Amino acid sequence: MGCILKGGGGLHSRLAVGAVLLAAGEARRMGGRPKPLLQLGGVPLIRRNLIALSGAGVDEVAVVLGHRADEVELALLDFPVTIVRNPDYERGQMSSMHAGVAALSARLDAIIVAMADQPLLNAEDVIALIGAFKKRGAASAVVPYVDGERGNPIILDAAVREAVLAGDANFGCRQWLAAHPEQVLRMDTGNRHYSVDVDSPEDIDRFVEQYGHPLRWPPDLAT
């Protein structure tokens, strides 16, 4: 069961919101260095994303680890979250998503699926996503789109969670969204916080060029 974030829930007490933060990837394009530990302003990206979720009033978070899990977990020791170690992380993101969703409590009305490599995401962005979900009408999911490009995080209702968990390990949120486009609400926005992530050294250089803020590895991972 996902741990309750201290102080969480106040902004959205009428809607119980949980989150899965995916941080298990192999980061092959980064030479195996774990992207969640890349730092902006001296703060690891995984911590920045947890701060954003907590600041938005998310009630509980499950963080899924895999590649170099021991190192990444050290960045989380003072956060009241559930740590989920996915032994099958090499099979891809869907297995990690399954593991994280299964770790959250059944009482939730909505689940955010977030990535740990988005340097710009903040609490206001998550609040806007939750706000769009509350106004979704008959839709079961809200997905941000930035200039026509799909972004992250996304937010799903409890029924989608159950559908995903009922499927096999190769059936995840992306497959559900593709199979049920009529139940997906697009949140069209010009806010690039939802679309900027860091997958490669070139992305790091591009981020510095566009935003003027360096992304740095901690000393033990610097080359």
Describe each model-derived feature in a short phrase:
Residues 2-16, 162, 168-223:
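Conserved alpha/beta core of the MobA/IspD/sugar-nucleotide pyrophosphorylase nucleotidyltransferase superfamily
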Residues 8, 12-66:
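N-terminal glycine-rich phosphate-binding loop and ensuing alpha1 helix
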Residues 33, 57, 77-80, 180:
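Short, structured coil segments at secondary-structure junctions
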Residues 48, 52, 71, 95-99, ...:
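Alpha-helical elements of Rossmann-like donor-binding domains used by nucleotide-donor carbohydrate transfer enzymes
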Residues 67-68, 88, 92, 124, ...:
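Short beta->alpha linker loops
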Residues 71-110, 170, 174:
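Short phosphate-binding loop-to-helix
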Residues 90-165:
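Conserved beta-loop-beta/alpha segment of the NTase-like Rossmann-fold superfamily
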